[in-house]
Amino acid sequence: IITIEDPVEIKQDNMLQLQLNPSIGMTYDHLIKLSLRHRPDVLIIGEIRDRETAQAVIRASLTGIRVFSTVHAKSIPGVYARILELGVSQDELDNCLAGIAYQRLIGGGGLIDFAQDHFQNHQAECWNEKIGQLLAAGHLTEEEAAAEKIKD
């Protein structure tokens, strides 16, 4: 496993961790190319922020290496749209994207309180109720709410 981060936040002894340093040419693009020479099983890229990084991540993925990264977006469809906005072609994205895991920050008491109140009791209806409240308050669109709801 090779990680490319800016900065390396948590040191992991069982991974090769590379940190960006653009002042000496250590960009995402350069470090991704460098890491491909090592043929890792998994490549973790800190964040896709620009066209150069998006293209490099897609190239790495198309070599058959499993690549994980983050993209800031407001919804699952927004992730897809954001990658297309960064110059990745529809065909490239269709050939390399295996899935999207999406998380939303929850306002209020915090994640631990929310998880204890809702998930430990396996209460999907509580989650769906909260999604409905967020929709009613204008924090979610109809599309986002439908994507977030837990289906039976």
Predicted features by range, described:
Residues 1-152:
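Short, flexible helix-loop junctions that flank or precede catalytic/ligand sites
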